[in-house]
Amino acid sequence: MSTMALWRSTFIVSAMTMLSRVLGLVRDVVLLNVFGAGKDFDTFVVAFRIPNFFRRLFAEGAFSQAFIPVLTEYKAGRAHAEVQILISRVFGCLLTVMTLLTFVAMVLAPAIIYMYAPGFHNDPEKFDLAVSMFRLTIPYLMFMSLTAFASSILNSYGSFASPAFSPVLLNVAMIAGAWWLTPYMAEPIKALGWSVVAAGILQLAVQIPELWRKNLLIPPKVDFKHEGVERILKLMLPALFGVSVTQINLLLNTIWASFMQDGSVSWLYSAERMTELPLGLIGVAIGTVILPSLSARHAEQDQEKFRGMIDWAAKVIVLVGLPASIALFMLSTPIIQALFQRGEFDLHDTQMTALALQCMSAGVISFMLIKVFAPGFYAQQDTKTPVRVGLMSVAANAILNVVFIGFFKLIHWQAEHMALALASSGSALVNAGLLYFYLHKRNIFRFGSHWKKLILQYGLANLAMIAALWFGLNWYNGELSQWIRIAEVAGLCVVGVIAYLIGLLVSGFRPRDLKH
């Protein structure tokens, strides 16, 4: 892809992601207003996080990172009929594995909940509800795995719109369930479980027309001995771990949080949702767009363009990610107050969530860079290096959790959940740093001398934004109505963006500096 084509594809994914994230914020506002940050919502967060984790692990994570490079190679060097056969065999194998996995997960639900939220076992009512919610939501895994399979095919063919749009349906379904289905349920929280399953079906359905138009809607056939399937499986096994380190760390944090005071899981979840906005808009969007392009450049043995694409992506990530991290830190309390503080979500919940968001904001830029650096290995069908890096990152997360929790207990700090957020940011920094180390060591990519000027320009622009936000916060009043708080936060964001853009302009930065 040319720079213009990369921008166009990134814009499409970012626009759809923006729609999804905005609806996601509306969803969270509705859910926290209806259910609050209490016991019932904690059980839903845990129950839904597990199938969501496996979705990212098997489907969007390891599977897509292994499948897209192989499919791209087939497209480049083989007949369309062979590509269709590959798709058919992968479809059949994936459907078989996910059906079996879903059934096993339903049978082993109590053990799985005990493993991922052992603290719930101390409250039998909470534990039983979590098991019931898990069994209700786990079919989502199968539907979303097939959705990710369809999305990977479409992305490989340069179609990004419908795959990027599908997450919107999850938010719409959950909002509808919370508003209209909850009153009819004996256990209101289960309305969310049924909504999740319905969303999975809808997300798969919207991919079908585009696959049909491209003559890629192929009936499934199970053949684990097919050459392409064997290669994908070989790449997937190590990638199962390496590509999903973030999700593993989040689940480890959920285990820790289940032993903490009620609300800890919900506070961390709400803060995590805020960090996902910039991560999804830019980090995930660019990672989604560049993997097929990097795979194609690798197949063509064009190392110069390969490096150029990573360099372009890193420039965009730092351009957007650094101010996003700073703004989330500075505006943490106003953002949480404006979006969530109403109904069952009170001032105490706002304060606890804002503390978690401040800690998580430090890791936003690292999480975004991971989305750029990791495809540099996967496009070359190297899944082992991210595994080694992932192991070190998980180890760092575990060590930092113990250190920070121990420190907070020592000083009798009540907001222990902050330790988990800090550990997540620290482990993300380790992950991104090590990925870059190996890219540099193997001469795949390194920051050139032009980055010195860019960092100076970015730094000056961020200082301008910090000054503007600091001044604007003096006028913020959290005691006013929610709509006025929302308007105030929107105004602060606009002021920050304007100050940042002026800072870039004054520093000499121009859009042409992003070309690769």
Residue ranges and their predicted role:
Residues M1-H516:
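Membrane-embedded alpha-helical bundles of multi-pass transporters/translocases
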